[in-house]
From Swiss-Prot:
ATP binds at K46, G53, R54, G55, I102, E107. Binds 1 Mg(2+) ion per subunit. Heterotetramer of two alpha and two beta subunits. This is Succinate--CoA ligase [ADP-forming] subunit beta. Pfam families: ATP-grasp_2 (PF08442), Ligase_CoA (PF00549). It catalyses: succinate + ATP + CoA = succinyl-CoA + ADP + phosphate; GTP + succinate + CoA = succinyl-CoA + GDP + phosphate. It comes from the Bacteria. The keyword NAD does not apply. PANTHER family: SUCCINATE--COA LIGASE [GDP-FORMING] SUBUNIT BETA, MITOCHONDRIAL, SUCCINYL-COA SYNTHETASE BETA CHAIN. Mg(2+) binds at N199, D213. Keywords: ATP-binding, Ligase, Magnesium, Metal-binding, Nucleotide-binding, Tricarboxylic acid cycle.
Length: 389
């Protein structure tokens, strides 16, 4: 689950990490009240969307007087941000973050994520901040320090000295930086985060360290432990299909192709998409219905796929391990009849009760093409999608 910048900053503040003052507004009236109450003369105004690259997309403004604060806020409330991270449909900012402008001397980067190769939480630090960390890793790898976080969830003194030296901190900055690192590790663990970053962490003109921007992503599988964090979820940052998919516990990602995919298992879904691409087609989505999908889930998966007008064919690829092929076939039939599907439907299934499942499909009276293997299924899906055009 992604969060907004202001929510991530609230979490950082809770753990004692210094962040600048900020205010949230979703209307012109609220902006006017903030300007008056806090006597703002200059401010940074930022859109609040679940994506980075907001500045380049026109979503960050520097206002040098109260009138500009109001005008820029009005411009950004309701603004649609479109970039690589939002996808072509973009994301709408329903509120803005207003923060008094401050003078800074230097920018740093601090973040924690999961490194699956090391099977460990990893701290990432760089004396260069305010830019995409992947860009630093690619262009200036010597400016990046990665340290696995020990099992005891705290760094030893020599680790902290190494980080402070690498970042170029001196004097009181060392003490402040060490405290921020320790609090960041604690916050990451206690929120069950998958990503927590401060970018940039800045040195103010007074020489103090301050978290100027923050990003927090929480592991969806751990949300059952965090009723308080569940309230941070903002459904407006998802498409209607993504929100529906989450409601029915379907893993769904919209793409830009013409072949809808319904698969059980993330690995099998990726392989299915690769084969479609290999044979000259383009997947319209990633949709994993999970190992124990019910007829209701299958039907909802169909509804989500069919809501995309670009879809010209649907490929269903199921391995009946946990899922029974007979149950799946019943779900397909019920959904297809109820939704009146008028585009080619290709089904490839293997596993438990596969013959009974195929028999049900064959006797359904529906125009369903049953294939024997995945390669044939992908080829047929591509050919039929092209014929619909």
């Amino acid at each position: 689950m992604n969060t907004h910048e202001f929510q991530a900053k609230q979490i950082l503040r809770k753990y004692g990490i210094p962040v600048p003052d900020f205010y949230i507004a979703s209307s012109s009236k609220e902006v006017e009240e903030i300007i008056k109450q806090y006597q703002l003369q200059s401010a940074i105004i930022k859109v609040q969307v679940h994506a980075g690259g907001r500045g380049k997309a026109g979503g960050v403004k520097l206002a040098t007087n109260p009138q500009e604060i109001l005008e820029f806020s009005q411009e950004l409330i309701g603004k649609k941000i479109i970039n690589e991270q939002t996808g072509p449909s973009g994301m709408i900012s329903h509120q803005v973050l207003i923060s008094p402008a401050i003078l800074i001397k230097k920018e740093f980067y601090l973040g924690i994520t999961i490194n699956r190769e090391l099977a460990s939480r990893v701290l990432i630090a760089s004396p260069i901040g305010g830019v995409n960390i992947e860009k630093i890793a690619h262009e200036q790898p010597n400016q990046l320090l990665m340290l696995p976080i020990p099992l005891e969830e705290t760094f030893r003194s020599y680790h902290l000295i190494r980080i402070a030296s690498f970042m170029g901190w001196k004097g009181k900055q060392i003490q402040e930086g060490v405290a921020i690192i320790q609090s960041l590790v604690k916050a990451f663990k206690e929120t069950d985060a998958s990503l927590l970053e401060i970018n940039p962490l800045v040195e103010t003109k007074e020489g103090h360290l301050l978290a100027l921007d923050a990003k927090l992503s929480i592991d969806d599988n751990a949300l059952f432990k965090h009723e308080d964090l569940k309230t941070l979820f903002d459904p407006s940052q998802m498409s209607n299909n993504e929100a529906r998919a989450q409601q029915f516990e379907l893993a769904y990602v919209a793409l830009e192709g013409e072949i809808g995919c319904m698969v059980n298992g993330a690995g099998l879904a990726m392989a299915t998409m690769d084969l479609i691409q290999y044979h000259g087609g383009r997947p319209a989505n990633f949709l994993d219905v999970g190992g124990g999908a019910s007829q209701v889930k299958v039907a909802e998966g169909f509804r989500i796929i069919l809501s995309d007008s670009n879809v010209k064919a649907i490929l269903i690829n199921i391995f009946g391990g946990i899922m029974n092929c007979e149950t799946l076939a019943s779900g397909i039939i019920e959904a297809a009849k109820g939704l009146q599907i008028h585009i080619p439907l290709i089904v490839r299934m293997e596993g438990t009760n596969v013959e009974k499942g195929k028999q049900l499909l064959q006797q359904s009276g529906l125009k369903i093409l049953i294939t024997e293997n995945l390669t044939e299924a992908a080829q047929q899906a591509v050919q039929l999608a092209q014929s619909v055009r």
